[in-house]
Amino acid sequence: MKLNELRDHEGATKNRKRIGRGIGSGTGKTGGCGVKGQKSRSGVSLNGFEGGQMPIYRRLPKRGFKNLFAKTYNEVSLGRIQLAVDAGKLNIEKSVDVAALKDAGIIRRFKNGVRLLSDGELKSKIVFNISGASKVARTKIEKVGGQINVPESI
């Protein structure tokens, strides 16, 4: 068998039906939409309309809200930081802050701060100046001789 002899199995592919291309095609004129009514018109139907039945979004109770003042943090794993150190993208001679993480390509868009998570292993002694870290991440950092400095204003 050669590459030019490769074929799909019989019945594996179907030809698509072109709608509204004459009565001989089987899907001409009304194009599978029936006759008259809202659903036969262009623009099809209304989203969430259930034919007069009380729609699901009105049957279910309202819940929760979006807090406009909630602070969101960039979450960075220790393993990701170690990869950047190994690749030479992150300089650990100085303390690591948001600007250093952004320059290394670890975070893209800065949110309200950076939070370290404990995924992966950290082998390098690093001093962090960031918004926060999980308890396990703190213990892992302190275990290798590093430290975390969290600003008072947060």
Curated annotation (Swiss-Prot):
PROSITE patterns: RIBOSOMAL_L15 (PS00475). It comes from the Bacteria. Residues 1-44 are annotated as: Disordered. Transmembrane segments: none annotated. Signal peptide: none annotated. GO terms for cellular component: cytosolic large ribosomal subunit. The keyword NADP does not apply. Keywords: Ribonucleoprotein, Ribosomal protein, RNA-binding, rRNA-binding. Residues 1-13 have a biased composition (Basic and acidic residues). One of its GO terms (molecular function) is structural constituent of ribosome. Residues 21-35 have a biased composition (Gly residues). The keyword Ribosomal protein applies. It holds the Pfam family Ribosomal_L27A. GO terms for biological process: translation. Belongs to the universal ribosomal protein uL15 family. Binds to the 23S rRNA. This is Large ribosomal subunit protein uL15. It comes from Bartonella bacilliformis (strain ATCC 35685 / KC583 / Herrer 020/F12,63).
